[in-house]
Amino acid sequence: MSFKDLRSFIDHLETNGELKRISHPVDPHLEMTEIADRVLRAKGPALLFENPVGNDMPVLANLFGTPKRVAMALGKEDPLALRDVGELLAFLKEPEPPRGFKDAISKIPMFKQALNMPPKTVRNPPCQQVVKTGDEVDLTKLPIQHCWPGDVAPLVTWGLTITKGPRQKRQNLGIYRQQLLGRDKLIMRWLDHRGGALDFKDFKEKHPGERYPVVVALGADPVTILGAVTPVPDAMSEYAFAGLLRGERTEVCKALSCDLEVPATSEIILEGYIDPDEMAEEGPYGDHTGYYNETDSFPVFTVTHITHRKDAIYHSTYTGRPPDEPAMLGVALNEVFVPILRKQYPEIIDFYLPPEGCSYRMAVISIRKQYPGHAKRVMMGAWSFLRQFMYTKFIVVVDEDVNCRDWNDVIWAITTRMDPKRDTVMIENTPIDYLDFASPVAGLGSKMGMDATNKWEGETDREWGTPIVMDEAVKQKVDAIWDDLGIDDAPTL
């Protein structure tokens, strides 16, 4: 099942008990965050605040607050089904020619999906039903959340920032938070390695001193939103990838002020430009780490046009100590990464990014070990293969008999199969998340790899322990007589 716009997804969630309408007045200043946070931690529904204090525009929150709703947005019921998305991405990153007629037939579904890649341009799009320019442009009239007490100002959080570099054929979609600075001003907080910042850098080099056109879409259809947070190949537009996932071409329209294309069914569109000479101090803001981040200088986005649907809905979120909505997205997208990594490293059994580790700062990988030093090879590969893992500080590698998603198993492996000196890899002066204040230098720090696998000859001279495992026949016999023993609540093994 695919959703043409955000509203059809909202209706689907409500029909299935996954969305709650809140008619009681709720203030976007702090109150929405507290309510959304409590509901998310209780694994509750998406929330539609119909009566935000000081505004008549409804606010949608917690849309992707559970992995199940992320899967539902892609027309699936089980987050594990998102591995199909990973299989598609693995194919797109490194397509292989068919090995014969039968293999060619098996690849037909993927080639058929590829036909849905080019976006479809439409006229009279819903996102331009209402047009505001000049003095009508007033960002303060949007119900922008002020998430935490220490935040310096309200913050646009779920905007899809649309850019295009002079050397690129495709447009880039990225999600960068934007601090409200004034009636027509936002601070565009994109880090140097992100697609929007790279496009802007290329533009400045080719067109020094000129204004850079930028568009921000709020409330796009759910597949396009998720396409913007998925590791799409660099040469592919997120619009094209969204078309693949949806099974239908992404509908776009031309922005009114520039040649950029925007999702046609979006709720709200902000059009404008960045002057390369206009910068502003951004922050502090509460972030997904659970701390307020440092302030820094970023470009100012000047909004010249606001267009929106009639009766528009404002899509918002908050970030804080996990679990938060980005952490839940991370849990779901974890399943996307597994097939991509397996294509490069078939020995990988499973891969886990614990949400409490800020969804990317720690990874646990289980492998089918085949030779001495194998765990270290996998560590190095994981750090370097995907850009998403360049900021992962800790990697633990375990054997296939260890459930890498069960901390009881992982801690057991670390404490029984590791020597701290022999089995720890330390690498200094590597890229680190800018928000990681624990690193000695902003953006530069160390990484630790832990080999918690059984050691082979060449890795140890000692006789290695054999795990204790009960005889399977005995277990089956005890299963058969358990009800006769009078012991309640048999543990699940």
UniProtKB/Swiss-Prot annotation:
Task: Give the reactions, separated by semicolons, that this protein catalyses.
Answer: a 4-hydroxy-3-(all-trans-polyprenyl)benzoate + H(+) = a 2-(all-trans-polyprenyl)phenol + CO2
**Protein location:** Cell membrane
- Residue numbers annotated as active site: 287
What metabolic or biological pathway is this protein involved in?
Cofactor biosynthesis; ubiquinone biosynthesis
Q: Which GO terms describe its molecular function?
A: 3-octaprenyl-4-hydroxybenzoate carboxy-lyase activity; metal ion binding
Q: Is Cell membrane found in the keyword set?
A: yes
Entry coiled-coil feature ranges: none
Cross-referenced InterPro entries, in alphabetical order? Answer: UbiD, UbiD-like_C, UbiD-like_N, UbiD_bacteria, UbiD_Rift_dom
Cofactor comment: Binds 1 prenylated FMN per subunit.
Matching entries from Pfam families are given as: UbiD (PF01977), UbiD_C (PF20696), UbiD_N (PF20695)
Positions that bind Mn(2+): 172, 238
Q: Which GO biological process annotations does it have?
A: ubiquinone biosynthetic process
Q: Where are the transmembrane segments?
A: none
Q: Name the cofactor(s) required for activity, per the record.
A: prenylated FMN; Mn(2+)
**EC numbers, comma separated:** 4.1.1.98
Similarity comment text for this entry: Belongs to the UbiD family.
Subunit text: Homohexamer.
Q: Its function? A: Catalyzes the decarboxylation of 3-octaprenyl-4-hydroxy benzoate to 2-octaprenylphenol, an intermediate step in ubiquinone biosynthesis.
Name the UniProt record assigns to this protein: 3-octaprenyl-4-hydroxybenzoate carboxy-lyase
Which organism is this protein's natural source? Answer: Shewanella pealeana (strain ATCC 700345 / ANG-SQ1)
Q: What is the lineage of its organism?
A: Bacteria, Pseudomonadati, Pseudomonadota, Gammaproteobacteria, Alteromonadales
Gene behind this protein: ubiD
